[in-house]
Amino acid sequence: MKISISANAPPWKRQEFAEQLTYVQEAERMGADTVWTLEGWGQDAVTPLAYLAARTHKIKLGTAIMQVTARAPAMTAMTAMTLSALSEGRFILGL
């Protein structure tokens, strides 16, 4: 059975990003398959995944919602390609 988790810390609370990292690393250690972030006013979905990609090894990283109206299609594609490279192919683009 595959298990997915959500990791969304408010962008204004640095301490909660550290707590989310611990949460995701522990979930990865326990065999979770994927971590998802979403986008809303005040926080993008990609930056937290880049942070997590640098500090995890196996867990897949996905955007549950990436606002296509907030960025140009070319920027969405470039962002996805960059995060896929940074995460060694673990990134899943969800629109």
Where are these regions (language model features)?
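Structured beta->alpha junctions
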Residues: 41, 65-68, 72
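A short, GP-enriched loop/loop-strand-helix hinge that lies immediately N-terminal to
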Residues: 60-66, 92-93
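Alpha-helical scaffolding within the catalytic cores
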Residues: 45-49, 68, 78
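Flexible, glycine-rich active-site loops centered on histidine and acidic residues
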Residues: 1-14, 72-95
